[in-house]
């Protein structure tokens, strides 16, 4: 099918790039090759063209280099696994997928490796160790819970594929908010910038609303950029396709609606931010850092989508050899 055109998306937040971007690019293959996460030449080329180093450098512009390297490797792990969930035979095997996820959660919670563990498990052991050298266990437990939510979303998508279901709009939005993984990458902004927001903020209803809106903004922009590839491959998990299918409108009209939804969400984010008011200077500093991380991810993700070739190619992956 023809490449769907991507109209302008509203984003008032400035582009920023971490000063270590060039060094990170040089480093970017080191970790994934050490753990043999790229199964073949095709996966190698796909990884290089995806430019995850640019996403990390754009989404975490103020991070120190060691934290940036670890975060880049987390992003690499998630995206490589995400391809297995979406493009390999696992995409229609929710039970198998769930078994993998349960084991990954055990690893993240401290379980030791066995002879049956996969390359992905071995990589997670390394990520856990390196992360906990620089982060508190309290923060890491939050991070694990966000990854668990991401895993849940991936399994729900696989269930729909196995049953041949096109989810209704409300169901799709619920699943997408999990499968996009934004809560986990926002938590990494705390890690990269060496702070942890206090519980009084993390549990505040307006902060939760900001997180939800940020999740939607990133989800809908990604759906716009990935629409051509996903629709051509027969994947129904895209807001453009869901609107096209259930509202019986053209794909072009559906794109216009998603762009409109995205832009309205950006305005909503700014409006909610303006309503925030806390009672101590310390809390104001912490929430400002966290909101800055949201802005960096929204802009960084958008810049990366334009720069990366991740969503430009249509291909089917062979299942990674789990040895």
From Swiss-Prot:
It catalyses: (2E,6E)-farnesyl diphosphate = 5-epi-alpha-selinene + diphosphate. Mg(2+) 1 binds at residues 82, 86. The keyword Transport does not apply. Mg(2+) 2 binds at residues 82, 86. GO terms for molecular function: germacrene-A synthase activity; metal ion binding. The keyword Lyase applies. It holds the Pfam family Terpene_syn_C_2. InterPro entries: Isoprenoid_synthase_dom_sf, Terpene_cyclase-like_2. Mg(2+) 3 binds at residues 222, 226, 230. Binds 3 Mg(2+) ions per subunit. Its cofactor is Mg(2+). One of its GO terms (biological process) is sesquiterpene biosynthetic process. Its EC number is 4.2.3.90. A motif (DDXXD motif) lies at residues 82-86. The Asp-Asp-Xaa-Xaa-Asp/Glu (DDXXD/E) motif is important for the catalytic activity, presumably through binding to Mg(2+). Belongs to the terpene synthase family. Catalyzes the cyclization of farnesyl diphosphate (FPP) to the sesquiterpene germacrene A. This is Germacrene A synthase. It comes from Nostoc punctiforme (strain ATCC 29133 / PCC 73102).
């Amino acid at each position: 099918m023809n490449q769907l055109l991507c109209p302008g998306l509203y984003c008032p937040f400035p582009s920023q790039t971490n000063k270590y971007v060039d060094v990170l690019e040089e480093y970017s293959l080191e970790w994934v090759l050490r753990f043999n996460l790229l199964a073949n030449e095709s996966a190698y080329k796909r990884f290089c063209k995806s430019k995850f180093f640019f996403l990390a450098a754009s989404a975490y512009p103020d991070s120190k280099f060691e934290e940036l390297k670890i975060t880049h490797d987390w992003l690499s792990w998630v995206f490589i696994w995400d391809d297995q969930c979406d493009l390999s035979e696992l995409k229609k095997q929710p039970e198998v997928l769930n078994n993998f996820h349960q084991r990954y959660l055990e690893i993240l919670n401290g379980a030791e490796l066995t002879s049956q563990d996969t390359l992905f498990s071995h990589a997670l052991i390394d990520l856990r160790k390196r992360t906990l050298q620089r982060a508190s266990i309290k923060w890491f437990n939050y991070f694990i819970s966000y990854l668990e939510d991401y895993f849940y979303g991936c399994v729900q998508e696989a269930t729909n594929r196995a049953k041949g279901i096109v989810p209704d709009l409300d169901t799709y939005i619920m699943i997408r908010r999990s499968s996009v993984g934004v809560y986990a990458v926002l938590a990494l902004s705390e890690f990269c910038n060496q702070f942890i927001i206090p519980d009084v903020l993390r549990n505040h209803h307006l902060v939760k609303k900001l997180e939800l809106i940020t999740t939607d903004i990133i989800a809908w922009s990604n759906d716009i950029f990935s629409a051509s590839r996903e629709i051509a491959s027969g994947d129904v998990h895209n807001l453009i396709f869901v609107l096209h299918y259930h509202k019986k409108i053209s794909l072009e009209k559906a794109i216009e609606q998603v762009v409109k939804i995205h832009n309205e969400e950006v305005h909503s984010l700014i409006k909610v931010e303006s309503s925030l008011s806390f009672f101590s200077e310390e809390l104001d500093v912490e929430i400002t850092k966290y909101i800055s991380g949201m802005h960096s991810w929204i802009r960084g993700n958008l810049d990366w989508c334009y720069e990366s070739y991740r969503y430009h190619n249509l291909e089917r992956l062979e299942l990674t050899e789990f040895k």
